[in-house]
Amino acid sequence: MTFIFNKSQLHDMQQIISLYKSFDKYNEYSREELYYHILPSVKLNQYKIIKENNKVVSFANWAYLDNNSEKEYKKTKDFSDKSWKSGDNPWVIDVVSKTNGAKMAYWLRSFFKKFKWMRSNNNFKFYRISKKGY
């Protein structure tokens, strides 16, 4: 079991989880499940948050996948925790925004020269996968 001991990251995690829980799409997930879902990216500092009035209103995380992990992710929509920083293929995993979604999109396009992503509906059915990256 892995935990975060950095107080700043722990505070971020609490606010990020609250952001997720503010969307019906994530109601079926416990706070613990969401914690473990975003833990690898936070531990590796592969995330960005935007705050308003000292509260997280937008969150994005990404993984650097190797070729095999990328193939697996495209096929299964999942990859192992050890794959989060296994290669040179940047994938944006989650973008969750109450406000400032456009600001987050601009930041991602500025931070990465190219990145890949998958888009899902509210039932987590993936309907669009980037082919060449942005």
Regions found by a protein language model. Name each.
Residues N68-Y134:
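Acyl-donor binding region in acyl/amide transferases
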Residues Y20, I38-V42, F111-R119:
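Hydrophobic, Leu/Ile/Phe/Ala-enriched alpha-helical segments that form helix-helix packing faces
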Residues K21-N27, L34-I38, L65-K74, K98-T99:
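Short linear motifs at secondary-structure transitions and domain/linker junctions
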Residues M1-F5, A60-W62, F124:
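Generic structural motif
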Residues Y36-E52, S58, A63-S69:
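A short helix-loop-beta-strand connector motif used in the catalytic cores of GNAT acetyltransferases and
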Residues T2-F3, E52-K55, K131:
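Asparagine-rich low-complexity intrinsically disordered tracts
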Residues M1-E33:
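Short amphipathic alpha-helix that is part of the acyltransferase structural core
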Residues R31-Y35, L108-R109:
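Short amphipathic alpha-helical segment that frequently serves as the phosphate-/nucleotide-binding helix
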